[in-house]
Regions:
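Structured, active/binding-site neighborhoods that engage oxygen-rich ligands
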Residues: 2-272
C-alpha cells in the first residue's frame, strides 16, 4: 500500500497498486494530526506509480530548522540600525548577546516551547504553553544558553500578568503592542493542524493571544499560518503570496498594513 497527499486539501489517500485506479478513503489512521507515513506522492499521477517528493518529515524538519537557522543568522545584526552593516551571508554568531555560531534567541526558544506543548498535550492548551514560556523565562527551558538572556517587553508583560492572574490569554490588546513575537514562534501550529484548515487558522490566532492580543498581531498570525500550510501542501510561491480563498480575513490584514506599514517602517530604525 502506498499513499499520496492531495495538495488542494491536505488529505491523505491510500492506494493499492494491485488495483489500478482504486483510491481508498478515509485516510491513514495516525496519532492526533501527526501522519504516520514516510512518503507522499503527486495526486495527479497515475494511480499505482510512486513519484517520490519531499517527505512530510523533510518539510516539517525544514520548517523548524529554517526557523532556528534564520534566527541564528539574524541575531548577528539584531538591534543594529538599518543600512549600517554589510549583508550577512553566513551564520557567524556574535550580536548583542555574544552567541556562539548556531545558537538561537528567544524567538526559537518560544517556538520550541509551543511545539513541545502541542505534542505533550495532544493539541492546543494555552495554559500549558504559558507554563512552558514561564519555564523558559525562569529556568532557561529550551534556551540555547541554558538561561533566558533576552525577552521582549510585550512577552514579559504577558508572562507577568499570567503569573498573577493565571489567565493564559494575557496578551495586551493595545495596537502599539502588535509586534511580531507571536509570528516568529508560530510554525508548530500549522505543522500540527495541517489536515484541518479551520483549526490551523483558529489556533494560530489563539496562540498569538497568549502574549500578543492586538488585532493586528492575531490576524497576521492567522494569515501566516495559512501561508505555511500552503507551502507544506506544495503550493507554488506565486499561489502562496497571492490573495487566496483560504483566508477569509485577508482584507483585514491588508488594511492594517495599508494604513500603518509606512509608519512602522519609519519608526522601526533597528533590526528586531
Amino acid at each position: 500500500m502506498v499513499y499520496y497527499i492531495d495538495p488542494n486539501t491536505g488529505r491523505e489517500y491510500s492506494i493499492d497498486p494491485t488495483k489500478r485506479g482504486a483510491v481508498t478513503e478515509p485516510l491513514i489512521t495516525g496519532i492526533g494530526n501527526r501522519f504516520d507515513i514516510e512518503e507522499d506522492y503527486l495526486a495527479d499521477d497515475e494511480i499505482g506509480v510512486k513519484v517520490k517528493m519531499n517527505t512530510l518529515k523533510d518539510k516539517y524538519e525544514g520548517c523548524l530548522l529554517g526557523l532556528a537557522c534564520g534566527d541564528a543568522v539574524g541575531t548577528t545584526v539584531e538591534f543594529k540600525p538599518r543600512g549600517s552593516f554589510a549583508p550577512i551571508t553566513d551564520m557567524v554568531g556574535g550580536g548583542p548577546f555574544d552567541l556562539d555560531v548556531g545558537q538561537w534567541t528567544d524567538d526559537t526558544s518560544m517556538a520550541l516551547c509551543l511545539a513541545e506543548s502541542l505534542l505533550a498535550q495532544n493539541g492546543f492548551d494555552a495554559k500549558d504553553q504559558m507554563d512552558k514560556y514561564l519555564k523558559w523565562y525562569n529556568d532557561g527551558y529550551m534556551s540555547s544558553k541554558g538561561y533566558c538572556f533576552d525577552i521582549g517587553r510585550t512577552v514579559s508583560s504577558a508572562l507577568g500578568k499570567y503569573s498573577l492572574h493565571k489567565n493564559p490569554y494575557a496578551g495586551s490588546t493595545e495596537p502599539r503592542t502588535a509586534g511580531n513575537g507571536s509570528i516568529m514562534r508560530l510554525a508548530a501550529i500549522p505543522l500540527y493542524y495541517l489536515s484541518n484548515l479551520e483549526k490551523t487558522i483558529h489556533f494560530a490566532g489563539e496562540s498569538s493571544r497568549t502574549t500578543h492580543g492586538a488585532e493586528e498581531a492575531v490576524e497576521s498570525a492567522k494569515l501566516f499560518a495559512v501561508l505555511i500550510r500552503m507551502a507544506l501542501l506544495g503550493h507554488s510561491k506565486q499561489d502562496i503570496l497571492l490573495k487566496n480563498e483560504y483566508y477569509s480575513n485577508m482584507d483585514n490584514v491588508t488594511s492594517f498594513y495599508a494604513n500603518h506599514i509606512h509608519d512602522k517602517l519609519n519608526n522601526e530604525k533597528v533590526i528586531r
